[in-house]
Structures are given as structure tokens and as C-alpha cells.
Amino acid sequence: MINISFYNKRYNNDNIIDTMSRSFGVTKNELNLVNNITLVISLIINKEKVGAICIISNNDLYDYMIRLGKNIEELNGIYLFRATKGAYIYNMAVDKRYRGHGIAQKLLDISLYVSKIKKFEYCYSHCENQISHHIFKKKGFNNEKHFKNSLNKEISLMSYWLK
């Protein structure tokens, strides 16, 4: 049985973030959740969390950067499109035991579906490795730009138009 759980961190406490951190062996800082306005989608199979992905609206991310007084174009290597009707998809994680079984594709499908429901015009993401690049490319995302982030790591900016 597959259950899909949605958590809007704006309305929930840190428990879901703690659970996500433990499930995927990362710290809260590595999850890089943005100011309690992230939608976290978890995929649960037989009561076990096997994957998760995060979405934030471009407007919310942009507003957050302004409040921090950060450069509009870059925040820790995250580049934004200037259009307002977009969703940023990030922090996709799949439990190592379930990799290679289409979990990442399913999480991405759900993210695109939620983005359509929310009336976003496009989604975008940053791919930091060949596996994530392949997953997004397979789903129909286009390469927009390649660059190095503030940590000198190669990044691909990829986009997907929903309309």
C-alpha cells in the first residue's frame, strides 16, 4: 500500500523535519528548508517513509531572500527565475534501500501535479549530480543554465513548463 503525506511546514512543528532528517541520514541544515514555508511531500510504503521532496513558491523564496537582505540573484548557490508563477522543487531524497524502483520519478510526478493544482506556470530545480539530472531530464525538464555555486560545485538549472 502506498500513502502520500503532505506537510506544509508553515503549519506544522519540527517533528516532520526531524523524521525526514533521520530517515535520510541528513542534518536539518542539509535539508535547507526555507523559513517554514516549504511543502514537504513524503512517499510512504507499508508505513515506512521511502522518499520525500520539497516545494516552495518562487514568490515565497524571493520574499525570504529580500527579508534576509541577500542578493536577489543568488542565495547559497540558488539562482531564481524572475517570473512569479513558479515553484522551486528541491531536496528530493529516496531511502537507499528503495533507489532504482521509480520512487524519485513518482515524487517528481506528485510535485508537478501539486504545482498544476496550485496554478503554477512552471517548476524549476537545481541538479547537483548526474542521477538527479537524469531523473529531471527523463521527466521532461530542460537545461536552462550550468554554473558553479558558491561552493564551486557544478549545478544545472532545469525547468519544466506546466502550461
Which sequence ranges carry the predicted segments?
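Short amphipathic alpha-helix that is part of the acyltransferase structural core
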Residues: 1-30, 35-59
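Conserved short alpha-helix immediately C-terminal to the canonical SAM/SAH-binding motif I
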Residues: 107, 131-132
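Residue-level recognition of the GNAT/N-acetyltransferase active site
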Residues: 90, 95, 128
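Conserved acyl-donor/pantetheine-binding loop and adjacent beta-alpha core of acyl/acetyltransferases
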Residues: 49-91, 151
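Short alpha-helical
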Residues: 11, 130-131
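Conserved acetyl-CoA-binding loop-helix of GNAT-fold acetyltransferases
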Residues: 94, 100-113, 138
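Conserved catalytic-core motifs of GNAT/GCN5-like acyltransferases
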Residues: 124-126, 142-157
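Conserved GNAT acetyl-CoA-binding A-motif
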Residues: 115-128
